[in-house]
Design a protein with these regions (language model features):
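Membrane-embedded alpha-helices of multi-pass transport/permease systems
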Residues: 34-38, 42, 89, 153-172
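Extended hydrophobic alpha-helices typical of membrane-associated regions
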Residues: 196, 200-264
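Helix-coil boundary and interhelical linker segments in multi-pass alpha-helical membrane proteins
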Residues: 7-23, 80-92, 127-144, 199-211, ...
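Intramembrane alpha-helical segments
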Residues: 26-28, 33-34, 56-139, 143, ...
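Conserved small/polar residues in nucleotide/adenosyl-binding loops
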Residues: 265-272
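Multi-pass membrane catalytic core of lipid/isoprenoid biosynthesis enzymes
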Residues: 23-28, 44-94, 169-209
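Alpha-helical transmembrane segments of multipass membrane proteins
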Residues: 31, 35, 79, 151, ...
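Core segments of transmembrane alpha-helices
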Residues: 1-4, 73-76, 118-126, 187-198, ...
Length: 277
């Protein structure tokens, strides 16, 4: 959700369309929910072999596979209706996003770093935001997308560390397995890469010091996460994963306050400029 909100603020220069913003927020809830359902559907046999996930509703029988499919189809149908309200200009990106929802859980069986697929899926709303706000994509759009992918690899690796031993046993693939003994270090590097890319976004869009200060705070948060997972205790890895909401929130407020300051500064200096004229 946070990268989508970043994209709205940057593409609109701090004045996003409230209607589109509201529709996209609903869309994120629907598609993420659909993603969780289809992920649990494909992973149900594997989840039964993992200590942390063996009690999930599909595994325990609280929900049948038929009910899961019906729920998934219903969520996708609502997403399509929402797409029609937003506009068909983003149809290609939306279709790609729907495909990625299905591909991601399957990718964990075949791709060594499925978190890359996850990042591409989670960032798919960014070009859609740019199209509805500006009518086109741009370099900033691409950079925010790349930052989102890098960030997804970072935080989902923490999540994957929690299940690493079980994933190795059952043959699942993950970035945590790929990174080996450096599985607690590489996520921090990807956090740094994310922030470096966002610095470039800030330069391109002439963002103020408040934004860069928020990136510095986000770096402190990512440092805390690195320390948190150092012992690889599953509950601490999950906490580090969840803590990334703070990372995204800080950057969002950095953008928001940066644009609010720019607007207030313009209003304060405008009368003086007119007086000189």
């Amino acid at each position: 959700m946070w990268p989508m909100l970043w994209a709205f603020l940057i593409s609109s220069e701090g004045s996003p369309s409230i209607i589109y913003l509201f529709l996209f927020l609903i869309g994120v809830v629907l598609t993420r929910s659909a993603g969780c359902v289809i992920n649990d559907y494909f992973d149900r046999d594997l989840d039964a072999q993992v200590e942390r996930t063996k009690d999930r509703m599909l595994v325990s029988g609280q929900v049948t596979t038929y009910e899961a499919i019906i729920l998934f189809v219903g969520l996708i149908a609502l997403s399509i209706l929402l797409l029609m309200l937003i506009g068909l200009d983003i149809l290609v990106y939306a279709l790609a996003a729907f495909c990625l929802l299905v591909i991601y859980p399957i990718s964990k069986r075949y791709i060594k770093i499925p978190q890359l697929v996850l990042g591409i899926a989670f960032g798919s709303s960014i070009p859609m935001v740019y199209i509805v706000e500006t009518g086109e994509t741009s370099l900033s759009c691409l950079l925010i997308y790349l930052a989102t992918i890098s960030w997804a690899i970072a935080y989902d690796t923490y999540y994957a560390i929690a299940d690493k031993k079980d994933d190795i046993k059952i043959g699942n693939k993950s970035s945590a397995i790929l990174f080996g003994e450096k599985d607690t270090i590489y996520p921090f590097y990807f956090h740094i890469l994310t922030l470096v890319i966002l610095v470039a976004v800030g330069v391109i869009n002439n963002l103020g010091i408040i934004f860069y200060f928020s990136l510095a705070l986000a770096l402190l948060v990512s440092t805390y996460q690195k320390i948190l997972v150092s012992n690889r205790l599953p509950y601490q890895c999950i906490s580090a994963f969840e803590n990334n909401n703070i990372f995204g929130l800080i950057i969002f407020f950095g953008l928001l306050l940066s644009y609010l300051y720019a607007v207030s500064y313009t209003h304060l200096t405008l009368p003086t400029s007119r007086a000189v004229e």
